[in-house]
């Protein structure tokens, strides 16, 4: 994989301050069964190269799917031309930044390779789909299976070489029930494929996908006759498949350093977080410990090196409630330091494909487990709601004021779980919400989750992220139902 690219690339490198080649090849297969009928399979092979050139302070890049010598030569020339055009006109002197010079390999650990034929995969999905139709009020249901194999090569003019291979699996299942003019849906892991992980067939067993159809359908039917979630100030216990969204929107996006520096302000927005907050800001209660951890082998966004070549390592983003680090990669950290801000970042510069430039992204952003069991958290609540599975979200362009909804809730009264409620929602402000964190679940309440659909950037990039979290209890939260 490396020999032909490396030799050709190094022959063509111009006399510049920095030049890199990043090759990406993805092979994916998406299979789906809807209402027991297989849908057309979608298979794709996508490959190409991104060239980056830094010279005399300018920064340029160019991508091509033509990986021949002439294609590489043309891409290098275009990237060099953009570097010349941006020299002295950019937000920073890029030649002043020291880029990583990595060397290494990484491969997703796979315990059980997926050896099933396409027919066998469809049969598995049809069996799970058939289990969903437990009542005539079930009007729509589907099961799907998405696998991706990715190969990457990163080479620089100064001798860096990194090879990485990843295997991703995304199982999904959803059910919709309808009666008396109302529809309610339940999904396995959420609408955005929360049980996605790296690995092989072991993910299916680990996620609990087999046998999930009947339970998911039963819960959709229960929601049809459930009362609306009550409104008012009360305690909330969020399970991991909602914590995933809470972490993503009100910790992950606000802490992306390029957003803090203003790069996204006219598109995806800014952040309520400012550079002077790092090291002192009380982001959450002392129970809040958030880590960036691309080293967790089976989590969705694990890797050994980011797309600028920075080595992956676990780091605390928030420790005992105090904001410590930003989600910023090599270049953004250097830009912040050039402005006089001595912030620390992580190895999180990533792109979604060969035809996009790397930018600051979430990777695996996790809440560390605490000491409380789920039973202890429930027992501590006088009045509240336990909520599962994200359904909807709305958050302002500084990632501060938010309103989130879940698929299903369960009342808690006097320390006991009560009946199911539908349309549970809550609202808050990121800058203060995490200070209401009152209990953090132990490892028995933790789920390792993620999503393939985190969007950001111009042109748009949709990337994989991971979120592992225990169940968490928050006090005095503004809760409301669909009529609230």
Q: Model-predicted segments: where are they?
A:
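Acidic low-complexity segments
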Residues: 6-10, 16-29, 74-165, 199-241, ...
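Structured beta-strand/loop patches that form or line metal/cofactor-binding pockets in enzymes
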Residues: 17-49, 138-162, 380-406
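A glycine-rich phosphate-binding loop feature that marks nucleotide/adenosyl-phosphate handling sites
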Residues: 22-34, 96-101, 144-151, 229-243, ...
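N-terminal alpha-helical targeting/anchoring segments
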Residues: 29-84
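Short acidic, glycine/serine/threonine-rich loops at helix termini
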Residues: 31-36, 149-167, 183-191, 245-252, ...
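Short beta-strand elements
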Residues: 43-55, 163-194, 316-319, 406-414
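Internal alpha/beta scaffold segment
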Residues: 62, 67-92, 166-259, 324-325, ...
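Dual-mode signal for accessory low-complexity, basic/Gly-rich regions
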Residues: 105, 266-484
């Amino acid at each position: 994989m490396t020999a032909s690219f490396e030799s050709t690339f190094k022959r063509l490198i111009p006399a510049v301050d920095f030049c890199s080649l990043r090759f990406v090849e993805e092979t994916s297969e998406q299979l789906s069964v809807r209402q027991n009928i297989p849908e057309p399979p979608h298979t794709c092979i996508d490959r190409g190269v991104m060239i980056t050139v830094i010279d005399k302070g300018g920064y340029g890049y160019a991508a091509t799917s033509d990986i021949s010598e002439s294609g590489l030569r043309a891409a290098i020339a275009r990237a060099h031309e953009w570097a010349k055009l941006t020299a002295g006109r950019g937000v920073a002197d890029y030649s002043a930044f020291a880029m990583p010079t990595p060397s290494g390999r990484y491969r997703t650990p796979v315990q059980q390779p997926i050896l099933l034929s396409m027919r066998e995969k469809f049969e598995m999905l049809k069996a799970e789909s058939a289990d969903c139709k437990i009542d005539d009020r079930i009007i729509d249901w589907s099961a799907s299976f998405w696998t991706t194999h990715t190969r990457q090569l990163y080479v620089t003019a100064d001798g860096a070489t990194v090879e990485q291979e990843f295997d991703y699996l995304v199982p999904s299942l959803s059910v919709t029930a309808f009666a008396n003019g109302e529809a309610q849906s339940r999904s396995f892991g959420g609408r955005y494929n929360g049980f996605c992980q790296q690995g092989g067939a072991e993910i299916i067993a680990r996620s609990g996908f087999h046998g999930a159809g009947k339970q998911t359908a039963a819960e959709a039917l229960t929601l049809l006759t459930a009362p609306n979630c009550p409104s008012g100030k009360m305690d909330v216990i969020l399970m991991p498949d909602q914590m995933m969204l809470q972490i993503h929107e009100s910790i992950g996006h606000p802490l992306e350093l390029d957003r803090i520096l203003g790069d996204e302000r006219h598109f995806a927005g800014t952040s309520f977080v400012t550079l002077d907050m790092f090291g002192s800001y009380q982001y959450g209660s002392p129970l809040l410990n958030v880590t960036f951890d691309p080293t967790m082998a089976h989590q969705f966004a694990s890797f050994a090196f980011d797309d600028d070549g920075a080595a992956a390592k676990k780091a605390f983003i928030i420790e005992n409630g105090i904001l410590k680090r930003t989600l910023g990669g090599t270049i953004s950290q250097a830009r912040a330091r050039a402005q006089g801000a001595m912030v620390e970042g992580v190895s999180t510069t990533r792109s979604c494909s060969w035809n996009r430039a790397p930018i600051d992204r979430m990777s695996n952003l996790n809440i560390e487990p605490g000491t409380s069991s789920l039973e202890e958290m429930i027992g501590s609540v006088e009045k509240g709601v336990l909520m599962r599975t994200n359904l909807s979200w709305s958050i302002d362009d500084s990632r501060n004021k938010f309103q989130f909804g879940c698929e299903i809730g369960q009342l808690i009264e006097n320390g006991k779980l009560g009946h199911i409620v539908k349309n549970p929602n809550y609202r808050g402000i990121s800058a203060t919400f995490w200070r209401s964190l009152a209990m953090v679940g132990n490892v028995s309440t933790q789920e390792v989750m993620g999503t393939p659909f985190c969007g950001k950037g111009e042109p748009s990039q949709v990337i994989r992220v991971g979120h592992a979290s225990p169940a968490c209890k928050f006090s005095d939260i503004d809760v409301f139902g669909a009529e609230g």
